[in-house]
Amino acid sequence: MKNTLRFVLRRWLLIVSAICLVITMTFCQNSAKRINSEADEYEILTPETGPGPHINGPLVYGCRPGHPFLYRIPCQGERPVTFSAESLPRGLILDQLTGIITGITPPQGDYDIVLSAKNKYSEDKRIFKIKAGDKLALTPPMGWNHWYAHYNRITDNMMREAADIMISSGMADVGYQYVNIDDCWMNALKHSDSLRVGPMRDDRGNIIPNRHFPDMKGLADYIHLKGLKAGIYTSPGPLTCAGFSGSYQHEELDARQFAEWGFDFLKYDWCSYRKIAGKDTSLEAYKKPYIQMGDLLKSLDRDIVYNLCQYGMGDVWEWGAETGAHCWRTANDLGYYLDKVYDVALKNAEHRQYSKPGEWNDPDYIQIGWIGGAGKQSAPAPTQMPPSMQYAYMSLWSLMASPLFYSGDMSRLDKFTLNILCNNEVIDVNQDPLGESGLVINHNDSSFLMVKNLYDGSKAVGLFNRGKEQREVTAEWTELQIEGRQTVRDIWRQKDLRILNYKFSTIVPAQGVVLVKMTPKN
C-alpha cells in the first residue's frame, strides 16, 4: 500500500511539475512576444549619420535688403568642420568654424552661393540661394515653441537651455532655427506665481516682462550667438490667452520693442481681442488687428516672420497673406485633439491651394516626446501617441509644407523622438523650394494617399493607414499622374526599394505611414 501511495504521489508531482513548466514557458514566450512587439513599435527608422559632413536646410532663403542677416548653416557630421561660401555677397561674413553667416542683407536680387563643409573624413557642397526682396519664410519656418511643454511655467533659463539643446541634440544641424517664447513672459495683474505679477506697462507705455525674464535683449542675444533666431508672442487684445499683458492700443510700441530686443518671429494670438471685436464677425473685423501689426512689422529695420494665430476664423487661409503674415493657424489648439491628428491634417490639406513660398497653412505644433496636458496645463509626461502615428504626424506636416515647430520638453529628448524630428530626407520634403502642399487622393475610411510635387520633378507620396490593424495600401501611377519606370525610395529609412512600372503596394502599420519618393528612371 505504501509503495502504491509513493508511486501515485511521485506521478502526481511529475504531472504538476510538467504543467508548471508549460505555464512558465508559455508566459515567457508571450512576454517575449509582447516585449519584441513593443521594441518593434519604437523602431528607429532614421539611419545614423556618418562622420562626414552633410549640409542640410533650405535651398532658398528670403530676406529684406539692408536688414541684419543671420543664418547658421545646418550641417551634420563630426566636428570640427571647416565651412566656406563661394560667391558670398558683399556685406555678409561667414565664420568658418561655426558656419554662421552674419552681416547686412545685400541689395535686392538673387545670389547663388556654393556652401562647403569639410572635415577629416570628406567634404560636402550645396547650392544655397539668397533672395533679397520682399518675402521672408520662403520655406516653412522650423524651430521650437515652449507652450505644450511649459505653459505658464516658462523662464529665461528654460529658453536658454532650449537653445543650447537645439545645438547639442543635432536639431539645428537639420534646419531647426527658431527658439520661440509663447505666452506668459509678460506681467499679469493676478497669477499664482508672484514673480509673474506686476505692472503691465511703464510710464511710457512700454511692456514690462515679468521677473522670470530679467533681460529680454540678453536672451535674444544669447540665442543669436548660437546662430539661432528668437521668437516672441503677444495678442492684439488687452490680455493674452493666459491673462497677461496684450498689445491692444500699444501695437507700435510693442512692435518696435520686439525689434529693439532682437526678436525674429512674432506669434500674434487673437485671445481677448474677441471682446474688442464684439459681435462684429465681418471679414474686415477679423483682418483689422492683423493688418495693423503686419504693416508695423514691415516698417521695421528687422526681418520678423509673422505668425497669425486666430484658429481659422473667417477662412483665414484665403486672406492671411494680405495682412503680411507668413503663416496662419488653420484650426484650434491641437493639444486638445492629439487623438485626431489625421482629422486635423486632412482638414488643413483642403486649403492646399493657399500654401506657397512665404505663405503657409499652420495646423499647430509637433507634440511628441514629453509634453504637458493641454487641458490642465500639466507638467510634461511621455506622449500617449502610438509610435506609428508619430511617424505619420511628422510625415503629414512635411507633405503639407506646414511650419515645423516642436513643442515638447527639450530637456527630455530621447533617441526615438529625435529620430522622428531629425530625419533630413523627411525635412527636405517639408523644405522643398517648390512650396506645394500635398494633395489627398484615394481617401476612404481606412486609408489615403497624400502626394506632393517636388522641385526636381519627383514626387513624395505618403501611404497612410488610419485603421487599428496593419493593411496593404497601393499607389497606382494613374492616381499619382506619373508614368513609366520609377525608382521608389523609402524616405524614413533613406534607402531605395526597387524600380517599378505601374504601381507600388506595401504593408502600412496600424495608424501609420510609409513615406516614399518616386523619381523617374531614365
In which residue ranges do the predicted regions lie?
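Proline/serine/threonine-rich low-complexity linkers at boundaries of modular beta-sandwich domains
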Residues: 35-53
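Solvent-exposed, low-complexity, repeat-rich "mucin-like" stalks and linkers
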Residues: 36, 53-80
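A short beta-strand micro-motif common to beta-rich folds, especially ectodomain repeats
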Residues: 73, 109-121
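Aromatic-lined carbohydrate-binding/catalytic grooves of carbohydrate-active enzymes
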Residues: 148, 162, 166-280
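Glycan-recognition surfaces
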Residues: 253, 303-409
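Carbohydrate-binding surface patches
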Residues: 391, 397-400, 405-407, 442-482, ...
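C-terminal beta-strand-rich structural cap/linker in extracellular carbohydrate-active enzymes
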Residues: 499-522
